Structures are given as structure tokens and as C-alpha cells.
Amino acid sequence: MTPDHGPLLYEGKAKRVFALAETDRVLVEFKNDATAFNAQKKAQLDDKGRLNCQISARLFELLEQHDVPTHYCGLVDDTWMQVRRVEIIPLEVVLRNVATGSLCRQTPIAEGTGLNPALFDLYYKDDALGDPLLTEARVQLLGVVKADRLSAIEQLARRVNEILCPFFAAIDLQLIDFKLEFGVTSGGELLLADEISPDTCRLWDRRSSDVNDRILDKDRFRKDLGGVMEAYGEVFKRVQSQCPNPRNCL
């Protein structure tokens, strides 16, 4: 069911954002579109939107229970959630607990190396530039955020990692790395935004020792491993076992 909403405000690779009568809130629809390599690889995956929406809702609520401020208000339907309206900061914030992916391609660090403390990486959110890796000095040069706001972002991101790592470990998942986005309300409040799902997290199954079978995230799509939705469904099943009843806005 499509809920009542106002005009489309923004459409990204995985979500659409619609206006609401309450100007401080918006509706987010999670799509079935799958993309990789800056949208060079595309596909439609049935049920992806529902699974990512439902996983994100539960993880946002988990984080709020640990005093992490998020934009999440509640579910509206299987693929829709209501969130607080924010201006997204054009930074992709990545926390890495285990070396893999681009970190291993760009450095001599061996695949699977544990990173303690977690590596905090920043990427400029710009498709035309390929979302380049930034230093903190470049963030300041670009004027993306001030130093104190960047410090607050890092503090929140590390807090999210501290909460999610043991949560996932309890359901036999290892949080390898993940991407976060943050936004600012009209009143200047910093909130965790976007989503937290197998699209944005690398999750390895502790119940499997096979290097491909253990992957339960978007890397299955990136690497043509198959079983993408089965993997997302398994993540949802385990998350739901700990967080069964997310709130809704109906």
C-alpha cells in the first residue's frame, strides 16, 4: 500500500523521499533497485526494499535505545518509513573493523586484518567525482562541515560501532565495515540519517568458514555470488529475532 504523501523531493539509487504536511518530517520509500560501482552495475531485486526498510527500522530503534539520535520516526508500511527532515551532510562516513575492499586495494594491508580502533574514513558524497576519499584537512578546505561538527560526527559514528558490533555478534554476524550518513535539522541538531542495512554494512556469517558463503551483504551483488536476497533475508531474520516489533506511524 502506498501511503498518502506530498510531492517527490529527492530520488537516490535506493530510496525516494516525499514531502508530508508536517514540514519537519518526510516519507522515505525503499526501492528494489540494486546498484554497485557508482551505479555502473544495476539490477532489480524483488523484496530488497522491504528487507532494507525493516532492518533499518529495527537498527535505528536499537541505536536510539542507546541514546544515539537518529532521523527515524516509525514505519508506515513494509517499504516506507517516516523520518525527521534533515539536510544531509555530503559525507559518507565509513567505520572499518576488518580490512577488506577498497582499503586492501589501496594499501598493502592484508585482507582480514583486524583494525582496533576501527578506522574512520570520510568520502565526499559526489557521484560525478566518484565519492573520493577525503582527509580531515580537505573536509575543512571544502567547507563541508566545521571541525567541531566533524568531531561530533566521528564520536557518534564510533558510538554506533560500539553498539552494533556486540549486537551483531550475538546473532552470529561480524560487522566488517559500514557506511553512515548524517543530517542536520532546521534547528541545528545532528542526526544519524539514511539507512543501516546489508546495502550499507559488510556482514560476515560467523556460522560459515567459506569466504564466499559467509558474505551476507551487498558484496554478493558486487561479486556476482548469487543468493543476494537470501542473504538479506537471513540478516533480517536474525535482527528480527532480537528486535521483533518496531514502532509505526499509522
From Swiss-Prot:
Signal peptide: none annotated. NCBIfam families: purC. Belongs to the SAICAR synthetase family. It catalyses: 5-amino-1-(5-phospho-D-ribosyl)imidazole-4-carboxylate + L-aspartate + ATP = (2S)-2-[5-amino-1-(5-phospho-beta-D-ribosyl)imidazole-4-carboxamido]succinate + ADP + phosphate + 2 H(+). Pathway: Purine metabolism; IMP biosynthesis via de novo pathway; 5-amino-1-(5-phospho-D-ribosyl)imidazole-4-carboxamide from 5-amino-1-(5-phospho-D-ribosyl)imidazole-4-carboxylate: step 1/2. GO terms for biological process: 'de novo' IMP biosynthetic process; cobalamin biosynthetic process. Its EC number is 6.3.2.6. Keywords: ATP-binding, Ligase, Nucleotide-binding, Purine biosynthesis. This is Phosphoribosylaminoimidazole-succinocarboxamide synthase. It holds the Pfam family SAICAR_synt. The keyword Cytoplasm does not apply. One of its GO terms (molecular function) is ATP binding. Coiled coil: none annotated. It comes from the Bacteria. It comes from Synechococcus sp. (strain CC9902). It is an enzyme of class 6 (ligase).
